From Swiss-Prot:
Lineage of the species this protein comes from: Eukaryota, Fungi, Dikarya, Ascomycota, Pezizomycotina
Species name: Fusarium langsethiae
Names of required cofactors: FAD
Signal peptide: 1-22
Protein name per Swiss-Prot or TrEMBL: FAD-dependent monooxygenase DEP2
Origin superkingdom: Eukaryota
UniProt keywords, alphabetically: FAD, Flavoprotein, Glycoprotein, Membrane, Monooxygenase, Oxidoreductase, Signal, Transmembrane, Transmembrane helix
Gene3D superfamilies given in the database record: FAD/NAD(P)-binding domain
Length: 521
């Protein structure tokens, strides 16, 4: 009899989620194939911001030093009004680092993906120009059929293929075919588009600090600048008119003409007290206009298919949590599979075991956190764009009162509750808050070491066996003796006036007075 092939994961999408998952599976010793419809590390897109929990994951994977070498530290943050005047500022990223333990870093997305790819130990597992056409589940396996006719067989398919996921559509069809109505219209329309954005990078402009974040609020749009010594990342968030807002399956695509039209309306607007947007636009290195979807789906898995990253949750860029949340998904999927396979070292898990593990250990542990992150990001986008009078009051007047330190601490609080790989030991960096999973594990270990160890009985007859159980009633006997002694003492004092051994003269005088009063009454 031939041994069955090892458990294998087919990852669809070689973006942040897919490449992170590939590294996680390498650490777990789980086989995989990574497919992408295009090429790895494409030129579109501008930047990714790695929050402390993203850096912690990279630290576990052994990728952190290589990534940090490609970018510089972030410094302070300033919030500005439509005229570019500062109304609040602080050492934002220093506060985040102090509370969470790791830096926040911004770098070119293409550079980041290239580093993750180059650090993979076996690049032959990565397939470019591999467009998925169909997924077939049969006999406890899955077959991924590509548009060019190639097939890849495995035990689990992970759709990490972005907000317009092909794997998600296939999973929806399979779910509704097996259980009509399982995937509702409400869920399919859960991701909404109410904003678009110009995402671009420019060379440095005199007057803008090399390490800071600048947020300049306007009426229904905002400028977000993340600055590095050699370039500046710029995102212009714009609220769409009601008649242009949409949900799935509508996909807004913008042309160069669309982007130029928007730029013409904002080119003279201040981004700082000394720089207007046109100066950044003139120095642009690359730019594109995109839709900003936001939302969280309810079903993350069905059968032997699971969704991750933007395919299942999408957050606006203001909070810089989207890519980090996708990395969290990769970690939890890998943890789930590592634990599941450890239960069956000599055989593969069944369909039911795979399905239940992915639902209970992955989906059910992730969905609430994803919703909280998406809401936080959406609220911040609207607040910074003065989207309504409440948002204006919060950003312009309450933020200076509350202080950016509070926002930085909240970001750090989200970071330290993120997961890490359960099977990779490393010397993590800690901030004031500490990593919650690590603290919980330490507390559990301490509680185990404090458990009283039962006293081993000596061989032969012991006092407890010899006395016939007499020791079990010793406490009751002692209480009875103490009560009897007190009664005798009280009787003795009342009627004789003598002292009770161990008590001072004040007690004797008290009982003498009591005696005389009682006897002559």
């Amino acid at each position: 009899m031939h041994d069955s092939p090892p458990f294998k994961v087919i990852i669809v999408g070689a973006g942040v989620t897919g490449l992170t998952l590939a590294h996680c599976l390498v650490k777990a010793g789980i086989d995989y194939a990574l497919l992408d419809k295009g090429v790895v590390a494409p030129g579109f897109g501008t930047t990714i911001t790695l929050q402390p929990h993203g850096c912690r994951i990279l630290h576990q994977l052994g990728c952190l030093d290589a990534v940090l070498a490609k970018c510089d530290v972030m410094g302070g943050a300033s919030c500005r009004d439509p005229n570019g005047k500062i109304f609040t500022s602080n050492d934002f990223f220093g506060v985040v680092r102090k509370f969470a333990g790791y830096d926040t870093r911004t770098l070119d997305r293409q550079v980041f993906l290239h580093e993750l790819y180059e650090l993979l130990p076996d690049k032959s597992k990565v397939y470019e120009k591999a467009r998925v056409e169909e997924i077939i589940e049969e006999n406890s396996t899955t077959r991924v059929i590509l548009a060019d006719g190639r097939e890849f067989a495995g035990d689990l398919v992970v759709g990490a293929d972005g907000v317009h996921s092909k794997v998600r559509e296939i999973m929806w069809d399979k779910a509704n075919a097996a259980h009509p109505g399982m995937i509702t219209v409400e869920e399919k329309r859960a991701m909404v588009t109410q904003y678009n954005a110009i995402v671009m990078a420019s060379s440095p402009v005199p007057g803008i600090s090399a390490h800071d974040m600048e947020v300049t609020s306007n009426d229904n749009y905002s400028f977000l600048l993340l600055c590095q010594p050699d370039w500046i990342s710029i995102i212009v968030h714009s609220k769409l008119p009601d008649d242009q807002q949409c949900t799935w399956p509508t996909r807004r695509r913008y042309t160069e003409t669309d982007m130029e039209e928007l730029v013409s309306k904002i080119i003279e607007r201040p981004v700082t007290g000394s720089v207007v947007f046109g100066e950044l636009w003139k120095r642009r290195l690359k730019a594109q206009m995109i839709s900003l979807e936001e939302g969280v789906l309810s079903h993350w898995t069905f059968g032997r298919i699971a969704l991750a990253g933007d395919a299942v949750h999408k957050v606006t860029p203001n909070s810089a949590l989207g890519g980090n949340t996708a990395m969290e998904d990769a970690v939890v999927i890998a943890n789930t599979l590592h634990a599941l396979l450890a239960m069956h070292p000599n055989k593969k898990p069944s369909d039911v075991e795979v399905r239940d593990a992915m639902r209970e250990k992955y989906q059910n542990t992730r969905v609430d956190r994803a919703r909280a992150i998406v809401k936080a990001g959406g609220d911040l986008t609207r607040q910074q764009a003065y989207d309504g009078w409440k948002a204006y009051i919060k950003q312009r007047w309450l933020t200076p009162i509350i202080g950016l330190d509070t926002l930085a601490q909240k970001i750090a609080g989200l970071c330290v509750t993120a997961p890490k790989l359960a099977y990779v030991d490393f010397d993590e960096r800690r901030g004031i808050l500490g990593w919650q999973d690590t603290l919980a594990a330490e507390k559990e270990r301490e509680s185990k070491t404090q458990v009283k160890v039962p006293i081993k009985q000596k061989k032969g007859l012991s006092w407890s066996t010899w006395n016939g159980g007499f020791e079990a009633i010793v406490p009751q006997i002692l209480v009875l003796w103490a009560g009897l002694w007190l009664a005798i003492c009280f009787f003795h004092l009342v009627f004789s006036g003598n002292h009770v051994p161990g008590f001072g003269s004040e007690v004797a005088r008290f009982f003498t007075v009591y005696n005389e009063t009682w006897m002559h009454s």
